[in-house]
Structures are given as C-alpha cells and as structure tokens.
Amino acid sequence: MAIKLIALVITLCVASWDVAQGRSLRFSTTPLNRYSFPPHFDFGVASSAYQYEGAVEEGGRSLSIWDNFTHAFPERTNMDNGDVAVDFYHRYKEDIKLIKEMNMDSFRFSLSWSRILPSGKLSDGVNKEGVQFYKNLIDELIENGIKPFVTIYHWDIPQALDDEYGSFLSPRIIDDFRNYARFCFQEFGDKVSMWTTFNEPYVYSVSGYDAGNKAMGRCSKWVNSLCIAGDSGTEPYLVSHHLLLAHAAAVEEFRKCDKISQDSKIGIVLSPYWFEPYDSASNADKEAVERALAFNIGWHLSPLVFGDYPETIKISAGNRLPSFTKEQSMMVKNSFDFIGVNYYTARFVAHDLNVDISRPRFMTDQHLQYKLTNRTGDTISLESDGTKILWSYPEGLRKILNYIKNKYNNPTIYITENGFDDYENGTVTREEILEDTKRIEYHQKHLQELQKAITEDGCDVKGYFTWSLLDNFEWEHGYAVRFGLYYVDYKNGLQRHAKHSAMWFKHFLERSGKPMPMDLFKSVKRWWSTLQMI
C-alpha cells in the first residue's frame, strides 16, 4: 500500500510539473472548463423514459408503441427490449447521486405518457402512481441541487392511441397531446422551469414512417420488406405536420398555465446533421447540401420561425406535403422560447440524378445521396464509433449553430444531446470500455467548437447535455451500443461503473476554478492503470 501511495505522489508531481511547463499538451495549454462558458451556462446529462425506466408493467403503466414494437418484431431491435432497461424506475436515487458526483447542473429526462395517462386520454383518468413517481424524481433532483429539464414526449406514445386512430397519422392526436401537456404543466410546473415538447421529430417521422426501422415501423413495402403497412411518400409528412400542430397546442397551454413561473421556458428538440459536398468543386453537390439542410432542419424549424415549410420541400413533395391554414400558421410561428439541438455527426452529400419518381418517398424527395467518403475517398473524420456510423466532426457543431443563427434569427439554443458510442460485439472487455479516451476527446473537441460558436460567432447557446448518463437501450441497436458516461453491467445486476469520461467531466465541471488539465488527467489515468498491475 505504501508503494502505491508513493507512486501516486510521484506521478502527480511529475504530471503537474509537465503540465506547468506546457509539455506534451495534445489538446491545449489552456484547457477548457466550466468557466470558459458564460455565467449560468447549463451542463447536464440526458436520458429518456423508455430507454431508462424499465418497469413497463409496474405502477399502473400501460404499454407504449415501443413495448409493442420490441415484442412483435424482436429481430428489429437486436432481440432486446426496454422491459427492464437500466431499471431507473427503481434506482433513480442512486443514479441522481452519480449526476451530482460529476458536478452536473441539470438532468434531462422524459415523461412516459403511458405511465401518466394509461389510455392516452385525460378524460379516461390519471394514473396517480405514475404521477407520484415523477414528483418523487423531480423532488430528488432538486434536493440534490440538480435542475430538472423535462421532455413531454420521447417517441413512446401509448399503444392505445395508435390502436384507436393511428396516433400521429390522425389530427385527433393534437387535442389528446394538448390535454396531456396541460396536465403535466399543472402537476409539475411549479418545480420544473425547462420544458421541451417533442424529441427529434425528424427521426420519429422518418425512421418510424419512411424507413420503418423504429416504431411505428411503417413504410412502403418496397422500402423495407419488414414493414407490414405504410406509405413512405406521404406518412412522414403527415406525422410531422400533426406533430408541429400538437407542439403549438402544447405551447399555448404552457403560456396560459398558472403553475408556470415567468422565468420558465419551453422549446422543441431537433436533430440536425451537418453536411459537406461530396465534390467540393461541384455546384450540384453544393446545392444538395442546401437541400439536405432544408429537409433536415428547415422541415421543422421553418414553420416555427416563419410559419411555413421551406420552398424546397414544397416543390419536391408537392401535394403530398400538408399545408397550414392561416390560423395554424400563426399558432405554430414563434411557438418556442428555445430550440434544442441534438448533434452527433456529419455526412457528405451528392446530388442524385437517378430518383425513381414512380416510387416517391421522403428520403428520395431530397434528390441526394448520403456518403461516408467524399469524391477523393476521404472520410469526414479520422474518428468513428465501432459501427462506422457516428463519425466525430466537431466543426459541424459550430457550423450548424452558425447556420441556424444566420438563417433563423439566432434563436436561443440548448445542445440537448451530444455523445459518442462504443459498440460491444462480445470481443471487448469491460475494462477496455471503461477506458473511453475516444469519448473524452469527442466531448472536449465538441466543447471547444461550441465555445468558439458562442464567444467568437455570437451564437446564443445556453447549455450542453451529454448523451448519456448511463449505457441504455439504444432503439434498433438494443444494448450493443453504449453511449453512457457510466457503464451498465447487463450481466451482473445492472451495476453502474464510472467510465474515465465520467471522471473527466467531474473535473471539467469543478467549481473551484482549478479543473484537471487533459494531460494531468491522462497521467493520473496511466498511474491508475499501473497500480492495477502492482
């Protein structure tokens, strides 16, 4: 033991001297920390109900579309489901302690509609046990000095509403969502000041109704043979149209709710990629970038800022795109206090001349192809996750923020998700996953670009949330993909183990004004690995 203590002292002294002399600083001689960002900038971790809670048949909860999807089509979610998930329903108190230990300010979580209103309709009655669970969760967060940041809907609509009228395919969803949101504001609004209505309407509409790889799992049969019904050319547009109207209806309720304080805010969470032209010398590919941004961001943000869809989408989709009435346009326009941005990665895009217009679908309406490499064969980044889907492109975060600032009147933004995953294919040990240097570098580089966007470019960004606190159920990837700052041992009672990234964030967010520089952090990490072999 004495040898270990001596080793620690020597290592820390050497590391501190190296850092003081500016040696081997691979990131920066003046590393970022909490104080590199504006006062009251919000740092937090994010989650969602279906991915975390489990307890799907406990406490009066009814089944959601994801319960049905994972059990009806297990092969489409890696044979996994959220029945237990990471058991947050029973373990939220211990998980809140993990958030506090990392010096995080906020916790973003979603409410399970089917846990609060089992039938989906307020008129059919409230599940008091479900309401009490969220009240207990909110109280526990506040008692630990953590701000609750609530999402009303994160993809898990009660199955009952889909059975009755097709959920977001029907305009009937607007009033049911309005009533659900109003109830949430009344019940939780006195203690929750930050709200979002919907998480990632683009992903919900496209993955659920164009590609069919997420619940609802609908698409044209020729797009995906696993889809049993759907129309990829019309349903994504219809779903998002009703979703935007439901969002606006909820915001109306928010702004007249007597339980909501004057400093409370509400928004919606979008999920933009950044795009670069496949051929930087091609005007057609540069125009494809603009179309990609219009479909990826403008589809939902343009109605919120300007009251209507982008002209590009109107032209491409024609009469398959629903239109707003004058009253609806006025209701949707300016129905936000801030915009949530979930940014992960970027793609190259090329103009596509070979679209089959006899088989319309949302993705081909864009007349472009997504590419992982450019014309010369270069990837957009040298760093990717194990699936080769998520490529780290920090510059894209700064670019997307400036694009939104310049095109959409510089709205207030929160980075509501940003994260990097490990792919567990059975060949990687727990120790290797815990030593998540790639994740640390991913977050540091994105935070550097975010800080530039704020201080140099004038982007109005107020917060940054990592995805995610814990490894969890990652939709069609099941539990094979791990985004957590904490490792969840699915084979041993769901034990939580801090990854190195959790320790890095703890020091990044220290309020002492003396954060751990990256090289000192790496020296300590090397020391710890050495001690394991003594």
UniProtKB/Swiss-Prot annotation:
Transmembrane segments: none annotated. Disulfide bonds join C219-C227. It catalyses: Hydrolysis of terminal, non-reducing beta-D-glucosyl residues with release of beta-D-glucose. Residues 1-22 form the signal peptide. Glycans are attached at N68, N374, N425. The active site is at E200 (proton donor), E417 (nucleophile). Its EC number is 3.2.1.21. It comes from the Eukaryota. It is an enzyme of class 3 (hydrolase). Keywords: Disulfide bond, Glycoprotein, Glycosidase, Hydrolase, Signal. InterPro entries: Glyco_hydro_1, Glyco_hydro_1_N_CS, Glycoside_hydrolase_SF. A beta-D-glucoside binds at Q51, H154, N199, E200, Y344, E417, W467, E474, W475, F483. Pfam families: Glyco_hydro_1. PROSITE patterns: GLYCOSYL_HYDROL_F1_2. GO terms for molecular function: beta-glucosidase activity. GO terms for biological process: carbohydrate metabolic process; response to other organism. Belongs to the glycosyl hydrolase 1 family. This is Beta-glucosidase 31.
